[in-house]
Amino acid sequence: RYAMRNEATLQAIQTNLNPGVYFSDVMGEMNKHYNEYLWYGSDHHWTGLGAYYGYVAFCKAAGITPVPLSSMEKKERKGFLGTLYELTRDQSVRDNPDRVETYIPPGIETKAIYYNAYDFKYPQLSKVFCPAPNYSAFICGDTPLMKITTNVKNGKKIAVVKNSMGNAFVVYLISHYEQIYVVDFRYSKHNLLKIMKDAQVNDLVFAVGMYAAVSRGTIGMMRNLAYQKNQDYDEVLKQEEAQRILDSINGVQDTVAVVQNQY
């Protein structure tokens, strides 16, 4: 019954998309695997496996070949009790804890940094995969704005507008994009259009739960991302480029010093 309601909602969303905006049939892809471990029993999020099938649906819409699940490194942490247990303290939920499964694509190196809600001062290092025994295993939880840089040198960049449902989805994109900008519409006061323009982002994807996709309040927050004012991101890019040049110069100086010491 509930699935039928969701299908009707998704159909309405798909019908009203503008040309050039592509619909990812996540529900259709997940329905093919309904008997697998797609949702936590004690939490409101999808699992790493459920998010993988969401990623497969995205790849089909984007014309990308998904990385086979069989080629990824699987890590598992047992004993996870999520929000449903935290809110109810129900013993039957406690007696059936979840397991957190992460699937790590092969051969990908990443660097993740996050910024506060209002500006680009004081960036903090983070990780794509965190050693957490809960849903924070994916991109270390929620932050207003995260930038992930990979060793995939294809020049492709993507921005992901998300709530916490998108965390487990983002981790699979590292195989396909050189840069990934992760924006949490609930917390970020950054101007997304300015960031996309300054960073020359190619793709934009919305990774949110059904309730967020149809809620007037959350739609308003996502719309605000286009109008909010913040520090120009191009200044951050200039600072990063200057730092790369400085690192390169220091690397050359270190090499020269080593050669001189040898003689």
Predicted region positions:
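Extracellular glycan-modifying ectodomains
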Residues: 1-263
